[in-house]
Swiss-Prot record:
Species the sequence originates in: Pseudomonas putida (Arthrobacter siderocapsulatus)
Name of the protein in its database record: DNA-directed RNA polymerase subunit beta
Catalytic activity entry: RNA(n) + a ribonucleoside 5'-triphosphate = RNA(n+1) + diphosphate
GO MF term (any one): ribonucleoside binding
Transcription among keywords: yes
One GO process term, biological-process aspect: DNA-templated transcription
InterPro entries: DNA-dir_RNA_pol_bsu_ext_1_sf (IPR042107), DNA-dir_RNA_pol_bsu_external_1 (IPR019462), DNA-dir_RNA_pol_su2 (IPR015712), DNA-dir_RNAP_su2_dom (IPR007120), DNA-dir_RNAP_su2_hyb_sf (IPR037033), RNA_pol_bsu_bac (IPR010243), RNA_pol_bsu_CS (IPR007121), RNA_pol_bsu_protrusion (IPR007644)
Keywords of the record: DNA-directed RNA polymerase, Nucleotidyltransferase, Transcription, Transferase
Entry GO terms, CC: DNA-directed RNA polymerase complex
EC category: transferase
Subunit structure: The RNAP catalytic core consists of 2 alpha, 1 beta, 1 beta' and 1 omega subunit. When a sigma factor is associated with the core the holoenzyme is formed, which can initiate transcription.
């Protein structure tokens, strides 16, 4: 096995038993692939597949004018280059986007000619606004903030059959319904009512009998009946009535007379119920006719109109019930044949017939008018309007589209074999749906499960962006159609016709304010990756929290391997927001697929297939952990399998597929929880959610007990610097890494240098700190894909969210009562949980009516001390340490002119104009904040003079630009001269550069020449002269290219900033705030075991073991049994073993043991006790020593979910580390030195500090803002509000009889406006009395009562 650069430095001991059949796929693929497909940027325009952006244009163009004399056609599009790179966009607060230019063709037809001859063609490129680009990490930068577009899970287009589960009608009767959902267009619903008539609704409006829709489609009553029913034929001859017998139709009926065969033998006696046995006998006897009494036909419904044979008069319309009167009429008219509908109560109900009876319409026009009235109530219907409306509803491609996916689902559901077809509905489609619905009501067929993942699909970024784009284009289409008629007369060009604003606005609105465009959760790498892999059922066209029931939220069997059953938020969104499983992907239709290994006749192959939930249903799927022998044959007599969405057992030869990996069930976050299989699901849910809230600590510390997924997350999240091409590290410092690319990785014309600029102390969306640290040294050889730099929360290329803490499970002095956590002071001293938070504070100078607001250090009425951290421009220095209330940016605002008092006039006369004209509106440090200024950015409007600070920042940026370019040129030049040196060495010179003819070139000769003189050499061989010329030209070209780059970047830096209207200048100050852990901060493990720090004890007081090693954290053992998250105990034991082994290695290194001894011990650790074997033989002695040095703090272990370490392996590891196999040890109280009465579980657990810090939550108020209406103080820290003294607290004071305290609470401390003002004044004067008055809420109550029309007044005595 080949190890990467970082893996060689620290190998994780892996306990997995199952081989890796398939690597975890790239975790951001769902976002990147979808948007790449949307833009189709790399494709050649002529050959673009009709998808996404191209499809949106194709669906709207060509646009033809109302007269038909002009048309605008779409030819193709191209994307420009972005104006700024991602970092600059974040800094400047602009959108990372590219201009979209569309080539359109305007065709003008000759009005005079009859066959539409083309008169004129104009082709032009039109600017269609900007399209945001996705960064390589799957995010968008919109107005300077990183956002993620969350994928949406919605109901797939197609047709669905369902029932109301008996909830609608009091009798509990099941009412069946069918719904045709298009991709875009009107929904069509069919539903039964309690009386078993079928109704139709369009777009959930008022219901109409379904027969109205059938009539509108052009079906007559007779055609409808023929479509849905078979008929019974009766022959009348005189007084006799005989039925053409189809024996099966008699099933279940009671015989009204004896039924004989031809011989007269009675087959069924009168009054007996006809059974299947009787039917068999009738069929054998070949009875074709059955004489029945005249009453037999009563109550039946006619299938065809009954016509008088002589006069042609219609005696009864079709769908008429046979009555005695009608029967007499028929007999009189000597009608010889009647056809009635065959219906029964078991499997052929009279539903459509009953519906026709309640239908008031009789022909197509009436039906169309009825539908028009329902859709447009109040408008007078005309024939044309009614027809147009109806055709536009379901039969117009512009207004209605099932989409290829919807058509496929539709055809499959109604039993057709072909899966392709038109995007609009046909008459046959609607009839087929009604037939299927009636069949289901008759007991044939089953309803659909709408929560099945075969009926729900995922809409990704690309698709949603395309839909928004199409919306914009449709708006453009309307405007263009109107202008097209003028195109010919006024000689307009395409550019004059198209206004791109609606498109740009639609795209901007989607990316800026759609419910699914979310502010990226950037707490740590895991939260970023999880946010991008999220699937939401909310959003436009989705569910709403209030309406979603239990079924939608619940885990469904089809979630297996597609959606994580564990990771979902707690609270109102539970089950509506899900996470993709680790191996899941979407197929071309947007359904989630999961990978499986193919199994043939009990033998497992390595072939992998991806299947959607529908395709998988018929397969028999074994679990990844099914037992196999060396020949990959399943060896159990019965294998645990999934089949038809049920869990069962089957013989090995029946198995057709097998899971790829045990962790394919869960999401990325859940697969990071070691021993997940031992945790209760509720706690695992909390664990996977809380990992996303972990704040990156000052020094990242890899988990001693992990799952092996840590490396994947760190690599795929994009937070680490990953090698793009192999090569050698040329230079490295804290801010960048320069790599000389290996020759075999460079293609002609490509750069030979890769420069990686590292991100230093940057603010994330959640105000945590982003900082990258290099892992490589100069001269190191690195391969493509190696990790070269860590970021916050990664350690040597592995995700590291928290710290490994030595913990003890014991109750101790009540400090860990109710999940509290007791910490040792050592944790604070060693800065284990110290985090850096970066806050951005912004000062905006606007233009005012009274004059511009100015950023200056000349602030009125402020002492020198307050200004000593500001420069002459009035902006704080970088590096200044500031506290609450300190001025960061001095700003003054002009005051309005008021009448001056004599005193003010005198002051003016003495001190001049300026002093009193302005008021201080400086940017100050908010309360409760203390930190260091780490960066200042100044943005100035074009045309406004830059201040000294802005010029200094600009100069600094201009000095930085050439560094990378010069570095690149140096390496390119050096590599070129190296190649020339090897080519020229030993060759003969013809002259030039001061060398004599015939001189043989050596290294000394070349060293004596300047670089420029090399190219003056004339060589004896022409090929070498040519090579020298090419090399010279190459260096000149590179220099020119780099100079052009420099000029571009210089222009970007020097140009003014694009600021909002009225804004002259913006100053952004970045404060770094260091937060140590303190009581009140929230901490958690990875198993949902969360708690608040209650006390930080001195190290000497903490419990310690016999060697005197104190524990860092004391947790309450009572938090484990009831929560059932036993995984934390196993993690603690294995963590102890990992640390013990590390200490053992450390002792060996201190004793300076030989590499061979270390190799033996490491082989014992990695290869003796279960799990994956590591090939340490390929390591050199130096590499073994480097590995051992990195393992001193503990040997990291990986215990993958559902395939982790067993109890015996943990014991073996503890034994190898010379530790008690129980994992428990005797502890002593640090304060009394007394031994605790029983051994205590001690070990190492990975603890996280969550982003719920007491500093952010603590808040105090004396006076502040008040609510406008009630005049009561506002609530919450953001509004600087007060604490609510609620009704229960009032009851408490009433119960105590504390009358004065109560009066104070309800008046002067709340909403007695005059009283509180007076009291404040009194306190200032040192007088502590209060005079309570009338509370404002009483006035509000009076106003409320008056608003009800009741006059109420307070009488004053």
């Amino acid at each position: 096995m080949a190890y990467s650069y970082t893996e060689k430095k620290r190998i994780r001991k892996d306990f997995s038993k199952l081989p890796d059949v398939m690597d975890v796929p790239y975790l951001l693929a769902i976002q990147l692939d979808s948007y790449r497909e949307f833009l189709q940027a790399g494709s050649i325009q002529g050959s673009l597949p009709r998808r996404r952006l191209h499809a949106a244009f194709k669906s709207v163009f060509p646009i033809i004018s109302y007269s038909g004399n002009a048309a605008l056609e779409y030819v193709g599009y191209r994307l420009g280059e972005p104006a700024f790179d991602v970092k600059e966009c974040v800094l400047r607060g602009v959108t990372f986007a590219v201009p979209l230019r569309v080539k359109v063709r305007l065709i003008i037809f000759d009005k005079e000619s009859s066959n539409k001859a083309i008169k004129d063609i104009k082709e032009q490129e039109v600017y269609m606004g900007e399209i945001p680009l996705m960064t390589e990490n799957g995010t968008f930068v919109i107005n300077g903030t990183e956002r993620v577009i969350v994928s949406q899970m919605h109901r797939s287009p197609g047709v669905f059959f369902d029932h109301d589960r008996g909830k609608t009608h009091s009798s509990g009767k099941l009412l069946y319904s069918a719904r045709i959902i298009p991709y875009r267009g009107s929904w069509l619903d069919f539903e039964f009512d309690p009386k078993d008539c079928v109704f139709v609704r369009i777009d959930r409006r008022r219901k109409l009998p379904a027969s109205v829709l059938l009539r509108a489609l052009g079906y007559s009553t007779e055609e409808v009946l023929n479509t849905f029913y078979t008929t019974n034929v009766f022959h009348i001859s005189g007084e006799k009535l005989s039925l053409e017998l189809v024996p099966q139709r008699l099933a279940g009926e009671v015989a009204v007379m004896d039924i004989h065969d031809e011989t007269g033998k009675v087959i069924v006696e009168q009054g007996r119920r006809i059974t299947a046995r009787h039917i068999n006998q009738l069929e054998k006897a070949g009875v074709k006719q059955l004489d029945v009494p005249m009453e037999y036909v009563l109550g039946r419904t006619t299938a065809k109109a009954i016509v008088h044979p002589a006069t042609g008069e219609i005696l009864a319309e079709c769908n008429t019930e046979m009555t005695t009167e009608l029967l007499i009429k028929v007999a009189k008219a000597q009608v010889v044949r009647i056809e009635t509908l065959y219906t029964n109560d078991i499997d052929c109900g009279p539903f459509i017939s009953d519906t026709l009876k309640i239908d008031t319409t009789s022909n197509q026009l009436e039906a169309l008018v009825e539908i028009y009235r329902m859709m447009r109530p109040g408008e007078p219907p005309t024939k044309d309007a009614a027809e147009t409306l109806f055709n536009n509803l379901f039969f117009s491609a512009e207004r209605y589209d099932l989409s290829p996916l919807g058509r496929m689902k539709f055809n499959r559901r109604i039993g057709r074999t072909e899966i392709e077809g038109s995007g609009v509905l046909s008459k046959e489609d609607i009839v087929e749906v009604l037939k299927t619905l009636v069949d289901i009501r008759n007991g044939k067929g089953i309803v659909d499960d709408i929560d099945h993942l075969g009926n729900r699909r995922v809409r990704c970024v690309g698709e949603m962006a395309e839909n928004q784009f199409r919306v914009g284009l449709v708006r453009v289409e309307r405007a263009v159609k109107e202008r097209l008629s003028m195109a010919e007369s006024e000689g307009l060009m395409p550019q004059d016709l198209i206004n791109a604003k609606p498109v740009a606005a639609a795209v901007k609105e989607f990316f800026g304010s759609s419910q699914l465009s979310q502010f990226m959760d950037q707490n740590n790498p895991l939260s970023e990756i999880t946010h991008k892999r999220r699937c939401s059922a909310l959003g436009p066209g989705g569910l709403t929290r209030e309406r979603a029931g239990f079924e939608v939220r619940d885990v469904h069997p089809t979630h297996y391997g597609r959606v994580c059953p564990i990771e979902t938020p707690e609270g109102p969104n539970i089950g509506l927001i899900n996470s993709l499983a680790a191996y899941a992907r979407t197929n071309q239709y947007g359904f989630l697929e999961s990978p499986y290994r193919v199994v043939k006749e009990g033998v497992v192959s390595d072939d992998i297939v991806f299947l959607s939930a529908i395709e998988e249903a018929d397969h028999v799927i074994a679990q990844a952990s099914a037992a196999m022998n060396d020949k990959k044959q399943l060896i159990d007599e019965l294998v645990a399998v999934r089949h038809l969405n049920e869990f069962t057992v089957k013989a090995p030869e029946d198995v057709t597929l097998m899971d790829v990996s045990p962790k394919q069930v869960v999401s990325v976050a859940a697969s990071l929880i070691p021993f997940l299989e031992h945790d209760d699901a509720n706690r695992a849910l909390m664990g996977s959610n809380m990992q996303r809230q972990a704040v990156p600590t000052l020094r990242a510390d890899k988990p001693l007990v992990g799952t092996g997924m840590e490396r994947n997350v760190a690599r795929d999240s994009g937070v680490c610097v990953v090698r793009r091409r192999g090569g050698v590290i040329d230079s490295v410092d804290a801010s960048r890494i320069v790599v000389r690319v290996a020759d075999d990785e460079v293609e002609t014309g490509e750069r030979r240098v890769d420069i990686y600029n590292l991100t230093k102390y940057t603010r994330s969306n959640q105000n945590t700190c982003i900082n990258q640290r290099p892992l490589v040294s100069k001269g190191d050889k690195v391969q493509r894909g190696d990790i070269m730099a860590d970021r916050a929360s990664t350690d040597m290329g592995e995700l590291a969210l928290g710290q490994n803490m030595r913990i003890a499970f014991m109750a101790w002095n009540g400090f860990n009562f109710e999940d509290s956590i007791c910490l040792s002071e050592r944790v604070v001293q060693e800065d284990r949980f110290t985090t850096i938070h970066i806050q951005e504070l912004t000062c905006v100078a606007r233009d005012n009516k009274l004059g511009p607001r100015e950023i200056t250090s000349g602030i009125p009425n402020v002492g020198e001390a307050a200004l000593n951290k500001l420069d002459e421009a009035g902006i704080v220095y970088v590096g200044a340490e500031v506290g609450a209330g300190d001025i960061l940016v001095g700003k003054v605002t002009p005051k309005g002119h008021t009448q001056l008092t004599p005193e003010e006039k005198l002051l003016r006369a003495i001190f001049g104009e300026k002093a009193s004209d302005v008021k201080d509106t400086s940017l100050r440090v908010p309360t409760g904040t203390q930190g260091t200024v780490i960066d200042v950015q100044v943005f100035t409007r074009d045309g406004v003079e830059r201040d000294s600070r802005a010029l200094a920042i600009e100069k600094m940026q201009l000095d930085e630009i050439p560094q990378d370019l010069n570095e690149e040129f140096r390496i390119v030049e050096g590599a070129t001269f190296e190649r020339l040196r090897s080519a020229l060495n030993g060759q003969v010179v013809d002259g030039g550069a001061g060398l004599k003819k015939g001189t043989v070139i050596t290294d000394e000769v070349l060293d004596g020449l300047d670089d420029g003189q090399w190219f003056k050499l004339r060589m004896a061989e022409d090929a070498l002269n040519e090579q020298l010329e090419k090399a010279q030209q190459y260096i000149v070209d590179r220099r020119r290219l780099l100079d052009d780059k420099f000029e571009d970047k210089k222009r970007n830096v020097q140009q003014g900033d694009d600021l909002a209207p009225g804004v002259l200048k913006i100053v952004k100050v970045y404060l770094a705030i260091r937060r140590r852990i303190q009581p009140g901060d929230k901490m958690a493990g990875r198993h949902g075991n969360k708690g608040v720090v209650s006390v930080i004890m001195p190290v000497e007081d903490m419990p310690h073991d016999a060697n005197g090693t104190p524990v860092d954290v004391v947790l309450n053992p009572l938090g484990v049994p009831s929560r059932m998250n036993v995984g934390q105990i196993l993690e603690t034991h294995l963590g102890l073993a990992a640390k013990g082994l590390g200490e053992k290695i450390d002792r060996m290194l201190e004793e300076q043991r030989k590499a061979a001894e270390l190799r033996v011990f490491l082989t014992e650790v990695y290869n003796e006790i279960g799990g994956r074997q590591e090939n340490l033989d390929e390591f050199t002695d130096e590499e073994i020593l480097a590995l051992a040095n990195n393992l001193k703090k503990g040997v990291p272990m990986a215990t993958p979910v559902f395939d982790g370490a067993k109890e015996r392996e943990i014991k073996a590891m503890l034994k190898l580390a010379d530790l008690p196999e129980s994992g428990q040890m005797v502890l002593f109280d640090g304060r009394t030195r007394n031994k605790f009465e029983r051994p205590v579980t001690v070990g190492y657990m990975y603890m996280l500090k969550l982003n719920h810090l007491v500093d952010d939550k603590m808040h105090a108020r004396s006076t502040g803002s008040y609510s406008l209406v009630t005049q009561q103080p506002l609530g919450g820290k953001a509004q600087f509000g007060g604490q609510r003294f609620g009704e229960m607290e009032v009851w408490a004071l009433e119960a105590y009889g504390a009358a004065y305290t109560l009066q104070e609470m309800l008046t002067v401390k709340s909403d007695d406006v005059n009283g509180r003002t007076k009291m404040y004044k009194n306190i200032v004067d040192g007088d502590h009395r209060m005079e309570p008055g009338m509370a404002e809420s009483f006035n509000v109550l009076i106003k409320e009562i008056r608003s009800l029309g009741i006059d109420i007044d307070l009488e004053t005595e």
